[in-house]
Amino acid sequence: DWSQTWTYFDGEWREGNLPLWGVRTHSIWLGSSVFDGARAFEGVAPDLDLHCARVNASAKTMFLKPTVTVEQWIGLVREGMARFPENTTLYIRPMYCAERPGPQALPPDPESTRWCLTLYDAPMRKPEGFSITLSPFKRPTLDTAPVDAKAGCLYPNNARAMFEAKARGFDNCIVCDFLGNVAELANSNVFMAKDGVVITPIPNGTFLNGITRQRVIKLLRADGIAVVESTLRYRDFENADEIFATGNASKVLPVTRIDERSLQPGPLYRRARELYWAYAHG
């Protein structure tokens, strides 16, 4: 069964997992959908404006026509949150899809763009840590895929990386670019710490520069902690003092095992999580 879900579509709120698209809908057929993911937890929804702005930017990248302003998205999110019990932990997903194909079927027709906003009950993972390994799959580049958008068509690559890692007994995996440089985890951005310095892969056009990632970097630097964006290899993570992840699923989480090496949640991870929670409630 689906958790409690509310969706705003065609001018009204509807409950449940709604069948909104048809068998000829372009985004279902040829993958032209975009979305974003924000969070509401403990009564707050940090950086909601940035998530709403990003879904509109993603739509333009994918040749869709965004028709909802950031302010309208935010207002609808607040309406949707009010439909749940107070302090319910929610996943917030604005989405654009193309209904019809454009010339020669392959591109979408921008004028057929439709949108919806879905909120659903989705508890965040407890900060108990998770295991990672190295994925054999690679991140695409900007000249091979629309990696500058949060597009649904990108996620099967992440999914196969996750499936492969789980088949080997790991929770997640580091995915590299075609040059062998670390890009991200299968579903989140990744950080490491060495000798008191936080280090994270520099955005190089192969992965999404996450909103939570950017926020954590700003918070750590404002707290006087050195954060370096750099080109990293897998061996750097194998030798790290700490590894942690940022993303919308659970915000800031520690990695407690890389391959067969155990790690403990360290002071820099803990500080990053503390700072983020303080910011969210500020």
Language model region names:
Residues R83-M95:
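Ordered, amphipathic secondary-structure segments that act as subunit-interaction surfaces
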